[in-house]
Structures are given as C-alpha cells and as structure tokens.
Curated annotation (Swiss-Prot):
Tissue and organ distribution: Ubiquitously expressed among various tissue types. Expressed in left ventricular myocytes.
Subunit: Component of a chromatin complex, at least composed of KDM5A, GATAD1 and EMSY.
Annotated zinc fingers (GATA-type), start-end: 9-33
Gene that this polypeptide is encoded by: GATAD1
Gene3D superfamilies from the UniProt entry: Erythroid Transcription Factor GATA-1, subunit A
Annotated keywords: Cardiomyopathy, Disease variant, Isopeptide bond, Metal-binding, Nucleus, Ubl conjugation, Zinc, Zinc-finger
Disease tied to this entry: Cardiomyopathy, dilated, 2B: A disorder characterized by ventricular dilation and impaired systolic function, resulting in congestive heart failure and arrhythmia. Patients are at risk of premature death.
Protein name: GATA zinc finger domain-containing protein 1
Length: 269
C-alpha cells in the first residue's frame, strides 16, 4: 500500500493494530481478526441458522455477516500454508549438507587493452614468476677484470689459514646464467727444488684435479702456459719441424751476394 495511508481492517473496521496481514483475496486484516478466525466462523454459522428461521431481511444480513466473517479462516489457512512452506524451506536449508561445496567460479580474465600502466600493476590476479633455470656455459677462454685467461694458465690461490699461495692450472671455464665466471683447477705440487718466493714451472708437477669449480674473484693470474708440459700451443724452445715448410724464400742477410742457381748447380756437379 502507498506510504502515508493508514490501513483499515475489512472485518472490524479498526485502524490501529500491532500487526497487519493480507487475506487470500487481498483484504486487509488486523491482528485481532486474524487470531479469532475459528471463533468468528462458528459464530457466523449460528447467525446464519437463526437468520433462516427469522425474517427475510434478517436472514440476508446474517448471511452477509457470515460470508464476511468466513473469509478470515480461509486467509488464515492460506497464510498457515505459506508459513509452513517457509518453515520447511528453512529446515531444509539448515539440514543442508555443507561438506560438498560447489567448485569456485573461474576467475575472469582481465583484459588490459586500452588501459593505463597503473591498472596493469593493480590486477587482482598476481602471476608468480617462473623459477630460474640454471644454465651453464663452458668456454676455453674468458676475459675477467682486464686479464685474458686461457686453458692452461697458471693461477695462485691464497689459503685463509696460513696465508700462503698455492698454485694451480686452469682446466676449463664455466659461466652461469648470472654471468658469474668460475674455473676448474688442477693443482700443481711443488718439489724440493721449487723456490718459495716465486713460481718456477720447471720445478712443479701436476697434482689432483678439483671436482668443484672456484670463482674467478679468488684466483690471481700468475702466467700463461709456459711449456708443452703445461699444455701450451707452441714451445718456447726451437723444435725440429715434423713436416716440410714450403712457400718460404731463403736468402742471405748482409753484404754477401746471394748464390745464383747456376753456381749452386756447378758446385754440386
């Protein structure tokens, strides 16, 4: 009903009630008329019987009162039916098994097309960064802190306990995904003829190989591979060529004239 209008009971015509209800046909009933629905219907029946024995006008009035008073029980019954249905629904809701819950709804994909930078960083669904995969790159030579290292170079490692240098030869280089450079070492064992204040490659022998590489920041460059014993590419001493060296022009250096081909042939003859 519209706001501001006072309801009026369709049976007793009262305008004040603690609670108002609607009947099955839409009539407005007060709380008192709703509560006495059964008694009103009984009284209406007796009034209707008396009306039949009396005059026609009285009978018509009694029938009218009986019809009006008989409507509340129907509304009460209809309301009771609705109330019972609500109670059944509430009980079923209470007794519902909550063990098996429905699957959560799938998250909606947020499209970032046409939106600003701040919206992209304020998304509700943060994505976890993938785990870093270690990738190792091996090399035969590296450049570290202005020094060009190669396989076979000799480096020194300072011991933390006694503070003495220990020499080793580089066996290989390793670089990880963070550009951290390391080297695999082969230790060089000194002999009785090895000097204490400097490194003499002729007096050292090759020792055990390390399984784990060491970082380049702990290594100090000593010298490149000094001889074939230390895996050098060329020997510092003259060697006899194992194959003929062709394509060279031989001549004398100095004031002595070069020997001609005819003179050399005549001398051999």
């Amino acid at each position: 009903m519209p706001l501001g209008l006072k309801p009026t009971c369709s049976v007793c015509k009262t305008t004040s009630s603690s609670m108002w209800k609607k009947g099955a046909q839409g009539e407005i009933l007060c709380h008192h008329c709703t509560g006495r629905g059964g008694a009103g219907s009984g009284g209406a029946g007796s009034g209707a019987a008396g009306g039949t024995g009396g005059s026609g006008g009285g009978g018509f009035g009694a029938a009218t009162f009986a019809s009006t008073s008989a409507t509340p029980p129907q509304s009460n019954g209809g309301g009771g039916g609705k109330q019972s249905k609500q109670e059944i629904h509430r009980r079923s809701a209470r007794l519902r098994n909550t063990k098996y819950k429905s699957a959560p709804a799938a998250e909606k994909k947020v499209s970032t097309k046409g939106k600003g930078r701040r919206h992209i960083f304020k998304l509700k669904n943060p994505i976890k960064a993938p785990e870093s995969v270690s990738t190792i790159i091996t090399a035969e030579s590296i450049f570290y802190k202005g020094v060009y290292y190669q396989i076979g170079d000799v480096v020194s490692v300072i011991d933390e306990q006694d503070g003495k240098p220990y020499y080793a030869q580089i066996r290989g280089f390793i670089q990880d995904q963070y550009c951290e450079k390391s080297a695999a070492l082969t230790w060089l064992i000194p002999t009785l003829s090895s000097p204490r204040d400097q490194f003499d490659p002729a007096s050292y022998i090759i020792g055990p190989e390390e399984d784990l590489p060491r970082k380049m920041e702990y290594l100090e460059f000593v010298c490149h591979a000094p001889s074939e014993y230390f895996k050098s590419r060329s020997s510092p001493f003259p060697t006899v060529p194992t194959r003929p060296e062709k394509g060279y022009i031989w001549t004398h250096v100095g004031p002595t004239p070069a020997i001609t081909i005819k003179e050399s042939v005549a001398n051999h003859l």
